[in-house]
């Protein structure tokens, strides 16, 4: 709930660990609802704790699961993968780091979005997919 301030979502599903989060995401697929999954282990367990080995292993497992998940998407589905900040596990200290965050958008007619100038383009793209006009940002659909 802290990511979206408990605003605009009907239900919050809890799960622990990436495997269970993927499972919960699959269960929600096809519901017609907007589903947001926060894979927080990258941040909480590996980023802030500066564990590059754990981060790398978790990323390999996550990447394999993403490949399977992509094959399950249906016509018209939209998948957006992004982050709210960087968290390089090799950097000194325990704070967030300043990398550009990835924005990967797949399905529903998404094309090559290139490098975006503003994160509000993510909101505009999701809004466009939902049929909601956004005041800020530019959709890549």
Predicted feature residues:
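Feature captures the catalytic ectodomains and active-site-proximal regions of enzymes
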Residues: 1-141
């Amino acid at each position: 709930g802290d990511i979206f301030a408990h605003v605009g979502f009907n239900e919050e599903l809890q799960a622990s660990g990436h495997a269970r989060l993927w499972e919960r995401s699959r269960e929600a697929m096809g519901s017609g609802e907007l589903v947001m999954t926060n894979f927080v282990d990258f941040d909480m367990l590996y980023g802030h704790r500066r564990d590059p080995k754990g981060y790398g292993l978790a990323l390999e497992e996550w990447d394999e699961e993403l490949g399977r998940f992509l094959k399950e998407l249906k016509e018209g589905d939209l998948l957006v993968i992004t982050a709210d900040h960087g968290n390089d596990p090799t950097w000194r200290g325990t704070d967030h780091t300043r990398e550009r965050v990835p924005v990967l958008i797949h399905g529903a007619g998404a094309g090559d979005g290139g490098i975006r100038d503003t994160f509000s383009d993510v909101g505009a793209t999701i809004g466009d997919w939902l049929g909601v006009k956004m005041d800020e940002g530019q959709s890549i659909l």
